[in-house]
Protein backbone atom coordinates (compact mmCIF):
# COMPACT_ATOMS: atom_id res chain seq x y z
CA UNK A 1 0.00 0.00 0.00
CA UNK A 2 1.28 3.46 -0.85
CA UNK A 3 2.05 6.12 1.74
CA UNK A 4 0.16 9.43 1.40
CA UNK A 5 3.32 11.33 0.41
CA UNK A 6 4.04 8.91 -2.44
CA UNK A 7 0.42 8.74 -3.57
CA UNK A 8 0.51 11.27 -6.49
CA UNK A 9 3.72 9.76 -7.89
CA UNK A 10 2.38 6.22 -7.51
CA UNK A 11 -0.85 7.16 -9.27
CA UNK A 12 1.01 8.56 -12.27
CA UNK A 13 3.47 5.65 -12.36
CA UNK A 14 0.61 3.13 -12.37
CA UNK A 15 -1.28 5.11 -15.03
CA UNK A 16 1.78 5.14 -17.31
CA UNK A 17 2.48 1.45 -16.72
CA UNK A 18 -1.05 0.25 -17.53
CA UNK A 19 -2.31 0.09 -21.09
CA UNK A 20 -6.08 0.51 -21.11
CA UNK A 21 -6.59 -1.71 -24.17
CA UNK A 22 -4.66 -4.53 -22.51
CA UNK A 23 -6.50 -4.07 -19.21
CA UNK A 24 -10.02 -3.99 -20.66
CA UNK A 25 -9.14 -6.66 -23.23
CA UNK A 26 -8.44 -9.09 -20.37
CA UNK A 27 -12.10 -8.77 -19.33
CA UNK A 28 -13.98 -8.04 -22.56
CA UNK A 29 -13.64 -9.07 -26.17
CA UNK A 30 -12.47 -5.97 -28.02
CA UNK A 31 -12.22 -5.45 -31.75
CA UNK A 32 -10.42 -2.78 -33.68
CA UNK A 33 -12.64 0.04 -34.98
CA UNK A 34 -10.73 2.83 -36.69
CA UNK A 35 -8.17 4.26 -34.30
CA UNK A 36 -9.81 2.69 -31.25
CA UNK A 37 -11.53 -0.46 -30.05
CA UNK A 38 -15.12 -1.42 -29.30
CA UNK A 39 -16.68 -4.10 -27.13
CA UNK A 40 -19.93 -5.06 -25.46
CA UNK A 41 -20.50 -3.26 -22.22
CA UNK A 42 -20.78 -5.69 -19.28
CA UNK A 43 -23.06 -3.34 -17.32
CA UNK A 44 -26.11 -3.50 -19.59
CA UNK A 45 -27.67 -5.87 -22.14
CA UNK A 46 -25.46 -4.89 -25.04
CA UNK A 47 -26.37 -6.45 -28.38
CA UNK A 48 -24.18 -4.07 -30.37
CA UNK A 49 -20.81 -2.95 -29.03
CA UNK A 50 -21.33 0.40 -27.32
CA UNK A 51 -18.23 0.50 -25.15
CA UNK A 52 -15.37 2.34 -26.84
CA UNK A 53 -11.72 2.30 -25.83
CA UNK A 54 -9.42 5.09 -26.97
CA UNK A 55 -5.77 3.97 -26.82
CA UNK A 56 -4.45 7.46 -27.59
CA UNK A 57 -6.23 9.05 -24.64
CA UNK A 58 -6.13 5.87 -22.51
CA UNK A 59 -9.87 6.20 -21.83
CA UNK A 60 -13.05 4.15 -22.16
CA UNK A 61 -16.73 5.07 -22.47
CA UNK A 62 -20.06 3.29 -22.76
CA UNK A 63 -22.40 5.51 -24.72
CA UNK A 64 -25.53 3.69 -23.46
CA UNK A 65 -24.68 3.72 -19.74
CA UNK A 66 -23.01 7.13 -20.07
CA UNK A 67 -20.07 6.02 -17.95
CA UNK A 68 -16.37 5.97 -18.69
CA UNK A 69 -12.98 7.14 -17.57
CA UNK A 70 -9.46 5.83 -17.24
CA UNK A 71 -7.85 2.59 -16.02
CA UNK A 72 -8.71 3.42 -12.41
CA UNK A 73 -12.40 4.04 -13.08
CA UNK A 74 -12.66 0.79 -15.07
CA UNK A 75 -11.22 -1.25 -12.20
CA UNK A 76 -13.38 0.58 -9.63
CA UNK A 77 -16.53 -0.13 -11.67
CA UNK A 78 -15.62 -3.73 -12.47
CA UNK A 79 -14.42 -4.69 -8.99
CA UNK A 80 -16.78 -2.49 -6.96
CA UNK A 81 -13.88 -0.96 -5.07
CA UNK A 82 -12.62 2.50 -4.16
CA UNK A 83 -9.76 4.38 -5.81
CA UNK A 84 -7.06 3.29 -3.36
CA UNK A 85 -7.97 -0.38 -3.84
CA UNK A 86 -7.95 0.07 -7.62
CA UNK A 87 -4.55 1.76 -7.41
CA UNK A 88 -3.15 -1.15 -5.42
CA UNK A 89 -4.64 -3.76 -7.78
CA UNK A 90 -3.18 -2.03 -10.81
CA UNK A 91 0.18 -1.52 -9.08
CA UNK A 92 0.34 -5.25 -8.32
CA UNK A 93 -0.60 -6.04 -11.92
CA UNK A 94 2.17 -3.73 -13.19
CA UNK A 95 4.73 -5.05 -10.70
CA UNK A 96 5.13 -1.69 -8.98
Where are these regions (language model features)?
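N-terminal structured subdomain of primase-like DNA metabolism proteins
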Residues: 1-96
Amino acid sequence: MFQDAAFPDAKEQVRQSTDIVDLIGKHLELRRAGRGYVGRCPWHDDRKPSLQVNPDRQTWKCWVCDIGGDVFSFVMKREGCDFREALNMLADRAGI
